[in-house]
Design a protein with these regions (language model features):
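Short amphipathic alpha-helical interaction patches enriched in hydrophobic/aromatic residues
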Residues: 5, 9, 48-51, 73, ...
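N-terminal hydrophobic signal/anchor transmembrane helix of membrane proteins
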Residues: 12, 22, 115-129
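Amphipathic alpha-helical segments used for helix-helix packing
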Residues: 32-53
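Short, charged helix-capping/linker segments at alpha-helix termini
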Residues: 77-83
Length: 129
């Protein structure tokens, strides 16, 4: 998954285009026949941190997603803003994934992208001052 996302993001230039590609990839996944939600999220939900061999894999996956998003954002934002935005964007895609699974609605990726656009506008306005 991380490799696919990385490859997809590498095909476009600019922070917005890369993040849009990230959300587009998720929307395509949400519409696929194999989509059953996030295995890593389910593992954490089922076992919590009581099964370290499972939870560590899930946490590593989430950290890899976070690093991927941070890598995109660091081209435009300082370290603090990059961390803040990446954390919120990861929460948005996690929520979109859960919602898409529960309600069979792949448009949640699009809604999360629109929320991300608003966050980017706000962050750019703050950094301009």
């Amino acid at each position: 998954m991380i490799e696919e996302l990385t490859a997809r993001i590498a095909t476009v230039e600019g922070v917005d285009a890369k993040l849009k590609a990230f959300f587009d990839w998720h929307e395509a996944w949400f519409t696929s026949e194999v989509f059953t939600g996030c295995l890593f999220e389910r593992a954490i939900g089922e076992y919590g941190l009581s099964e370290p061999e499972l939870s560590e894999v899930a946490v590593r996956h989430k950290k890899a997603l976070l690093a991927l998003i941070e890598g995109v954002l660091q081209d435009e934002f300082d370290a603090g803003e990059t961390k803040r935005l990446a954390g919120v964007i990861l929460m948005l895609i996690d929520g979109a994934t859960a919602h898409a699974r529960a309600f069979r609605d792949p448009r949640t990726a699009r809604h999360a992208w629109r929320a991300t656009q608003a966050l980017l506008v706000e962050a750019r306005q703050r950094s301009a001052h």
